Amino acid sequence: GGCRYFLGGCSEHSDCCEHLRCKMGLNYCAWDGTF
């Protein structure tokens, strides 16, 4: 359970915590530009 934090590994956006999204191809969570 739980969400992935900044630079955490991911396979889709829903893996990442709020305000983060999965960078496709690089497979880590990055800030999505929102607050």
From Swiss-Prot:
Signal peptide start and end residues: none
Family per similarity comment: Belongs to the neurotoxin 10 (Hwtx-1) family. 62 (Vatx) subfamily.
GO cellular component: extracellular region
Tissues where the protein occurs: Expressed by the venom gland.
Stored InterPro entries: Huwentoxin-1
Chloroplast is among the record's keywords: no
Lineage of the species this protein comes from: Eukaryota, Metazoa, Ecdysozoa, Arthropoda, Chelicerata
Function: Gating-modifier toxin with weak activity on Nav1.7/SCN9A and Nav1.8/SCN10A. Inhibits Nav1.7/SCN9A peak current (IC(50)=334 nM) and shifts the voltage dependence of activation to more depolarised membrane potentials. Shows 21% peak current inhibition (at 10 uM) on Nav1.8/SCN10A sodium channels.
Modified residues (Phenylalanine amide): 35
Designated name of the protein: Mu-theraphotoxin-Pm1a
